[in-house]
């Protein structure tokens, strides 16, 4: 399972708001909603987020095995 908790920490660390992603970097509100809910996003969106925040995919998402997720 892919989780997006690193995104929120990266945004905080870099001082980037959801507002800035939506209005300055054209990331849709729907995309951020899907990420908050743990739903799938495209590689194009991952690329756009990395470009906007000058980071890597590891700064945006994390793989957690089903066993680890069940233990939490």
Feature-to-residue mapping (PLM):
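A short, Lys/Arg-rich alpha-helix, primarily the initiator
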Residues: 1-20
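Short, charged recognition helix plus adjacent turn
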Residues: 9-10, 34, 61-72
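Alpha-helical residues within the helix-turn-helix
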Residues: 12, 23, 51
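Short amphipathic helical patch at the helix-1/turn junction of helix-turn-helix
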Residues: 12-13, 37-40
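Short alpha-helical DNA-recognition segment
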Residues: 15-33
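Short, basic-rich loop-to-helix N-cap that marks the start of a DNA-contacting helix
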Residues: 39-51, 69
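Short, charge-rich amphipathic interface segments used for partner binding and complex assembly
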Residues: 47-62
